[in-house]
């Protein structure tokens, strides 16, 4: 019986497919796609964070896409939810008190400490959120999205509208990252080819 060793070969280099998909993210910052006051103003960096995270979590290999999606998406949402809870506490409780800077910073720290408890304890007890890095993708992305003024409904609006817009926007942007990682590999049309001179009896 002849055994032939094989290796994987990219029909289209992933450097090309990845760069092509990355280029599509410019649409996320276009504020002229929808009529005002609506606007598509998603944070592109949120896509790249979870795009890299997709491969770090084990994606990219044959049959690994679905398990990696399951590993990441609920955990990202969990982090996003508690980011929103922290944002509401910082903006609508501490921010409305008119306190001195030292006291405000102290209370800010307490809020962050409290919202991190369900995040960190939850990983011990609930299987779908055990992949801790993905939780913090969502948590950090919410804060950077909100305080940077990004969102699908940005601008000088009601604060509640803006903060919930940031919550939804952050999750959608993070959710696109693993899809981009999957498509990067899929578009490369990877196939197995024999290694030259590897045939053995």
List PLM regions with ranges.
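Alpha-helical transmembrane segments and their membrane-interface boundaries
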Residues: 2-60, 160-170, 174-184
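Hydrophobic alpha-helical transmembrane segments
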Residues: 12-16, 69, 73-77, 106-110, ...
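Transmembrane alpha-helical segments of multi-pass membrane transport proteins and ion-pumping complexes
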Residues: 18-31, 54, 76, 80-92, ...
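Pore- and pathway-forming membrane helices of multi-pass small-molecule/ion transporters and channels
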Residues: 23, 36-62, 113-155
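Alpha-helical membrane segments and adjacent membrane-interface helices in multi-pass membrane proteins
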Residues: 41-90
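Non-transmembrane, aqueous-exposed alpha-helical and coiled segments at domain scale
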Residues: 67, 92, 96-97, 103-122, ...
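Membrane-interface helix termini and inter-helical loops of multi-pass transporters
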Residues: 93-101, 150-161
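Short, highly charged, low-complexity non-transmembrane loops/tails of multi-pass membrane proteins
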Residues: 190-201
């Amino acid at each position: 019986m002849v055994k032939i060793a094989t290796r994987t070969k990219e029909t289209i280099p992933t450097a090309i497919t990845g760069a092509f998909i990355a280029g599509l993210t410019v649409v996320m910052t276009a504020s002229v796609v929808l009529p005002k006051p609506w606007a598509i103003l998603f944070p592109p960096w949120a896509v790249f964070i979870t795009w890299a995270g997709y491969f770090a979590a084990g994606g990219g290999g044959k049959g690994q896409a679905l398990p990696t999606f399951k590993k990441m998406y609920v955990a990202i949402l969990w982090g996003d939810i508690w980011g929103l809870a922290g944002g509401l506490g910082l903006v609508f409780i501490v921010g409305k008190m008119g306190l001195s800077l030292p006291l405000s910073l102290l209370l800010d720290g307490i809020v962050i400490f409290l919202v991190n408890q369900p995040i960190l304890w939850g990983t011990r007890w609930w299987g779908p959120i055990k992949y801790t890095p993905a939780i913090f993708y969502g948590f950090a992305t919410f804060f950077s999205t909100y305080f940077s003024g990004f969102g699908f409904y940005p601008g000088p609006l009601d604060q509640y509208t803006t903060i919930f817009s940031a919550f939804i926007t952050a999750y959608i942007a993070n959710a696109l990252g693993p899809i981009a990682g999957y498509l990067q590999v899929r578009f490369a049309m990877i196939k197995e080819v024999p290694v030259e001179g590897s045939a053995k009896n």
